[in-house]
Amino acid sequence: SSTPRELAFYPNVKMEGNAFRYNPKTGKVVLSSHYEDENGYTAAKIYLAQITPKGKLEVGTMERPLGHDSRDQSLFIDDDNTAYLLSATNTNSDINIYKLDASWTKPVELVNTICKGLHRETPAIIKKDGEYYFFSSKASGWYPSQTMYTSTTDLAGEWTPIREIGNNTTFDAQFNRISKVGTTYGVWR
């Protein structure tokens, strides 16, 4: 398997679902990715690194989080600046929620496993008025699929039954991410 310095020399390495988040506690930007090496989709790792402008890339994690396979992933930052990694696991059967360390580059605790056996991917969480909302698409490769959501008041607690949102093919696309502009949230597809 590849080491952080070798990544640039492997043209077949896949880094998918790349996202960047600014960590105000460290003053660094955190990169999160689903990492696969040149052997196809067998590595199932998470790649978490941090960098500053003109600074050196510091890799925190390039492995399976706490030993679990990891495919589609995203980061959620709570109101108290605690970061969580959301990760499709068990070959996309379930979604794991991991608490990250203060640098946001290392999983330290498996908080919950949700959507068990539902084959969801492209995980995303928003928080509004004290309620957490989890959105995802059905694991269907790159084909259009139904966006669904579930909610809770405690990431480690019970979640509501999963519910549909939008039409059955997310308007001939697949749910991707959620962005917030001002006080309004928007779904990317």
Please place each PLM-identified region on the residue numbering.
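Carbohydrate-active catalytic/glycan-binding domains of CAZyme proteins
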Residues: S1-R189
